[in-house]
Amino acid sequence: MLRTPLYELCRTGGGRMVPFAGWEMPVQFSGLIQEHKAVRNSVGMFDISHMGVLRLEGANPKDTLQQLVPSDLHRIGPGEACYTVLLNDQGGIRDDLIIYDLGAIDEKRGALVLVINAACADSDTAWIRERMEPAGLTVTDIKNNGVLLALQGPQAIPLLEQLSGEDLSGLPRFGHRDLQIQGLSNSVFTARTGYTGEDGAELLLTAEDGQLLWSQLLEKGVAPCGLGARDTLRLEAAMHLYGQDMNADTNPFEAGLGWLVHLEMPADFIGRQALERAAETGPNKRLVGLKLEGRAIARHDYPVLHNGEPVGVVTSGTWSPTLEEPIALASIPTALAKLGTNLSVEIRGKAQPATVVRRPFYKRP
């Protein structure tokens, strides 16, 4: 089992460690609901060092990487980033990722950074290398046993401003830059991104700097948060979890990610023909939000029923600490995906009433 450079700090700081995607990671510290509310109301921090980080360098790297993603990479420029997906030949989703444009590194070459999911990191890296290196790009794992730390919540950016002495009001959502943070030896790659539905930043640091910053943040009263709160936060924000809400058999239209597909651009990409056909016919199934009556929680793969008959499955479900009711994402036939449709979810042999509602369940006012 792999361990991040923050493992000991998490364990000795009260983290309950569990296996996740081949890593020992903290599932919670003080308690899921307390951690969840810290992020919604103030600020929390997460060790996300299990995720993969690749750097691609070469001539025209966006043109070359464009072969692998359906989103027009020329919509972002240096200092900007985009969320997108990797596809297979059938238009199914191999993984989701964020691509950061670092701009030119010399007269002839540019660079991109890719952050990929932990569970897919090895297969993604091999697959990307196999396609990008023959096309002239170098692909380097730059995490190098370093730290990825997510600082999330309405007080995250003010706290970073305090630690760096910089005004970050001009850093837009999905913008990124290097920051000098007091007490750290190296500059810190800082992106205004996250997986919680709150403002915040994700930071890439050396192992030593990551440990120092984690300790600094603890001293400032920042709540350490585990995978449990990360999941409830992202689910309230209706953010997808790869392997549950989408997979290699789900295309972006079926996953509610059709906005990532830019078929109007001339560039070819893996899965383009399949997505052109899918766009023409429309999806047979859709990912929807559900609110359930009562307090029973719908979990992954629980059957969704219509008039007592199975019609789909729950992809993710939880108790929402913010809304104080059960919520879920579910894959159901397009014909039943209209807002307000009454369905039910089979939970421990009982049909629990549920209603199709607008996503996300929570949005920062």
From Swiss-Prot:
EC number of this enzyme: 2.1.2.10
GO cellular component terms listed in the entry, alphabetical order: cytosol; glycine cleavage complex
An individual GO BP term: glycine decarboxylation via glycine cleavage system
Keywords recorded for this protein, A-Z: Aminotransferase, Transferase
One matching Pfam family: GCV_T
Gene3D superfamilies: Aminomethyltransferase beta-barrel domains, Aminomethyltransferase fragment, Probable tRNA modification gtpase trme, domain 1
Lineage top rank: taxon: Bacteria
Principal EC category: transferase
Reactions listed under catalytic activity: N(6)-[(R)-S(8)-aminomethyldihydrolipoyl]-L-lysyl-[protein] + (6S)-5,6,7,8-tetrahydrofolate = N(6)-[(R)-dihydrolipoyl]-L-lysyl-[protein] + (6R)-5,10-methylene-5,6,7,8-tetrahydrofolate + NH4(+)
Gene Ontology MF annotations: aminomethyltransferase activity; transaminase activity
Function of the molecule: The glycine cleavage system catalyzes the degradation of glycine.
Oligomeric form and interacting partners: The glycine cleavage system is composed of four proteins: P, T, L and H.
Similarity comment text for this entry: Belongs to the GcvT family.
UniProt protein name: Aminomethyltransferase
Native organism taxonomy: Bacteria, Bacillati, Cyanobacteriota, Cyanophyceae, Synechococcales
